[in-house]
Amino acid sequence: MSEQVDLRHDWTLAEIEALLQSPLMDLLWKAQAVHRSANPGYKVQLASLLSVKTGGCEEDCAYCPQSMHHSSDVTGQPDLEVKAVLDRARVAAEAGADRFCMGWAWREIREGPAFESMLSMVRGVRELGLEACVTAGMLTDSQAERLAEAGLTAYNHNLDTSPEHYDSIITTRTYQERLETLQRVRQAGVTLCCGGIIGMGESVRDRASMLQVLACLDPHPESVPINALVAVEGTPLEAQPSIDPLELVRMVAVARILMPQSRVRLSAGREQLNREAQILCLQAGADSIFYGDSLLTTSNPAVESDRALLAAAGVQASWHESAAA
């Protein structure tokens, strides 16, 4: 059981910016104290991610190789069939994953056979004993309600960056539309998975601003993925330099302090980190990782590598329990 922690929804930009710029050891100590109080036991959730609909997206997100506006090697592919998706979910469950996330490269959910297939996938994933998460762009109230009825655990819809930096990253969807999507998901009774990306040319103040938006949601998102840009050839951000790994550690730590009971998920860009940097992220409060060899269209550490990482860090994950059963 987690201890009582102080949950705030009134964080100021100045407070968050000061945390991001505080001495690293002080920041890690504070994040550790919050994490131990709110989430004792160091249990790490393992989430597997599959691209159901790859490429051909109408959005122009500057970081994304799936956009039809860019010239990456990713091309539009047909949707995966329900059986193929559930077969992959079964493999993920057998490998020890807790959550199965499914992605559609869409601007918004489309009514019709594709949506009915999505609902079938959600039901099938839940029947396997896994949490089910979907990311597919904007949605209507009725679509959110039908997903909830199908058993959807979480809907992912990231903010990507701060309101101030947003227009330099995407022009085909407004920040307000993102916030409205989050509200529809919440009203349907589905939990939120919402975070962002660093390394896209934003300032420290932008990072603080994005975290402020997240931390002032009431309630906080249940899952907060922290991503580092994976610069892909053919996208507008292809030449963006890699971030210092300690910048990602700082983002994880501040997210943990601001949102004590949320799952802080170490997400895209993790493959660029060495083992020690990943363990620092776990120490800073990350309590979930994407587990499996790929994330949509980018690579991810191998399963055996992640098992070795978690063992070295001394943290528990569901595959430990499976092995002991």
Curated annotation (Swiss-Prot):
Binding site for [2Fe-2S] cluster: 101, 133, 193, 265
Subunit record text: Homodimer.
Name this protein carries in UniProt: Biotin synthase
CDD domains recorded: Radical_SAM (cd01335)
Protein family membership: Belongs to the radical SAM superfamily. Biotin synthase family.
Taxonomic lineage: Bacteria, Bacillati, Cyanobacteriota, Cyanophyceae, Synechococcales
SUPFAM superfamilies associated with the record: Radical SAM enzymes
Cofactor(s) needed by this chain: [4Fe-4S] cluster; [2Fe-2S] cluster
Keyword Transferase assigned: yes
GO biological process: biotin biosynthetic process
Record function comment: Catalyzes the conversion of dethiobiotin (DTB) to biotin by the insertion of a sulfur atom into dethiobiotin via a radical-based mechanism.
